[in-house]
Amino acid sequence: MKEKIKEKILNLCNLCGKCVPVCPSYRVYKKESFSPRGRLFLLSHEIEHKSFEFCLFCERCERICPHHIGFPTFYLEKLKEKENPLLTFLNLNNFINLINLKKELPTKIMKEEGDIIVYYSCGLKYLYPSALERFEEILKKRGISIGVPKGLVCCGAIFLNLGLISNLKENALKNLEILEKTKGYLVIFCATCLWMFKKIYPQVFKDTKYEKGFIELSKRAISAYNYLSLKAEDELKILEEKKLRENILFHLPCHLTEDFNLVKNKIETRDFCCGSAKFFLWLKNFQKENKRLWVKNLENIEILATFCTGCYLNFNALLKKPPLILHWLELL
C-alpha cells in the first residue's frame, strides 16, 4: 500500500469506535476485525484479512466518523493497485432470476436528447421501468423533456463488488464517452448508481487524464427524487399521502443518504442496510444473517419501497409477499 495512505489512516483514525456499531458486518459477526476500525488497523499494517471482503461499501463508517474517513475509501485505493483477482464467477442470470423481471421499455420510444438526461440503468431496464414512465409523465406536464442516450452500460458496481477494477473502468469510460456529449442534469433512479457516478468514478480515475471529466459528470448527477423535489414538489406529496392511507415503508438505501439529506423532511423513511447485493456475501449466507437485524421494521407492512437496485434485488430474494417490493417513484 502507498505510504501516504498508511500515514493518513494512522494520523486520522483516533480509534474512538463510533464506526463500530453502525457497521453491518460487525453487527452480524461481533468481531473487532470485522469492524471499520479493525479493518483500518489491519490495512494500515498491510495485513490481508478475510474481513475485507465482508465490507459492503455502505460508507456508514465514513458518515459517522469525526474525521470523515472510512474503510471503503482506503480499500478501493488498495484494489486499484491490484490486477483483477482470480475469481469464481457466478452466473448472474441465476441471481437475477430470483425475482420476476419486468419487461424492458422499448428503446425506440425514447429520445436520445432532452432538457435532462436519464441514466438508463439495469434497474430501469428490467426491474422498475414504470418508475421512468411515471417520471416522464410528470415532467411532460411541465414542459420538460428527457433524453435517454443509447449505448450506456451498467455503472460497474457489480465489478467493484468483485474487485474487478479494470472492468469497472471500462464501463465508466463508455458512459463518460457518451454522457460528456450531453448537457443538463444527469438523473439517476438507483442510489448505488448515483454513488458510483458521484464518488467512485472520480476516485478510481484520480490523477489521470479522465479525472476532470468524471468530476464534471459527478456535478451533474442527481437522484430522480431530488430532481422532482426541485421541479415538481407537489407530486411528491402523493407519496406521503399514500403512506398515511396504506401500510407503506419507504426504505432509505445507504448510498442515497447524502443526496436525500437535501430533501429529507419531505417524506418519512426508515434507514437500514439490506446487506448489499454483493455475490460473495450471498455465498457466505451473510444477507440472511443480516436480515434478522432489519426484518423487524416490516411488521404489518404491505409495500416496501426502495430506491436502489441492489436493495430491490435483496428484498425480493429474501422476503415473501407481503410486502410487495417497489421503487419509490412507482407509487407516484
What are these regions (language model features)?
Residues 10-28, 53-70, 121-125, 151-162, ...:
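Local cysteine-cluster metal-coordination motifs and their immediate loop/turn environment
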Residues 286-302:
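A short, acidic, amphipathic alpha-helical segment used as a generic capping/interface helix at domain edges
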Residues 10, 34-205:
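Iron-sulfur-cluster electron-transfer modules
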Residues 177-178, 302-303, 316, 323-332:
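Active-site anion-handling motifs in enzyme catalytic cores
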Residues 183-185, 300-303:
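Short active-site oxyanion
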Residues 208-240, 269-276, 320-332:
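Short, flexible loop segments at boundaries between secondary-structure elements
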Residues 1-33, 39-45:
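Long terminal accessory regions outside catalytic cores
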Residues 116-119, 125, 224, 228-266:
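Basic- and aromatic-lined ligand-binding clefts that recognize polyanionic substrates
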